[in-house]
């Protein structure tokens, strides 16, 4: 224990000095900053390729949007028809949720409320 206590201040000093040297060397390496204008041939080529891909997928995006809009319109019309059917003065009218139609209780045929 006596041998260790004599060397302890020396070891602590060496560790502290090593950390200071390490910290200053790290600061010196991170002082570089590279600024590009962003107008290189590679960036123009990349932008051109992205534009091509965007144009190629345009038709697919339009199809998806049309399908989504069509499904929404169908659901909206079914909601309106359900309200009309439930508020109908015809006591034999009922709403069939599976087929989204207003049916006659007696015949099972589609009716317009």
Swiss-Prot record:
<comment type="similarity">
    <text>Belongs to the UPF0482 family.</text>
</comment>
<feature type="signal peptide">
    <location>
        <begin position="1"/>
        <end position="28"/>
    </location>
</feature>
<dbReference type="Pfam" id="PF06932">
    <property type="entry name" value="DUF1283"/>
</dbReference>
<dbReference type="InterPro" id="IPR009700">
    <property type="entry name" value="DUF1283"/>
</dbReference>
<protein>
    <recommendedName>
        <fullName>UPF0482 protein YnfB</fullName>
    </recommendedName>
</protein>
<keyword id="KW-0732">Signal</keyword>
């Amino acid at each position: 224990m006596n041998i260790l206590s004599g060397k302890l201040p020396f070891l602590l000093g060496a560790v502290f000095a090593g950390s200071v040297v390490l910290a200053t060397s790290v600061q010196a390496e991170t002082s570089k900053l590279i600024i590009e204008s962003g107008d290189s041939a590679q960036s123009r080529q990349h932008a051109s390729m992205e534009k091509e891909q965007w144009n190629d997928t345009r038709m697919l995006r339009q199809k998806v949007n049309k399908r989504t809009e069509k499904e929404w319109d169908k659901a909206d019309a079914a909601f309106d028809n359900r309200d009309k059917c439930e508020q109908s003065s015809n006591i034999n009218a009922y709403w069939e949720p599976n087929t989204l139609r207003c049916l006659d209780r007696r015949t099972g045929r589609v009716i317009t409320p």
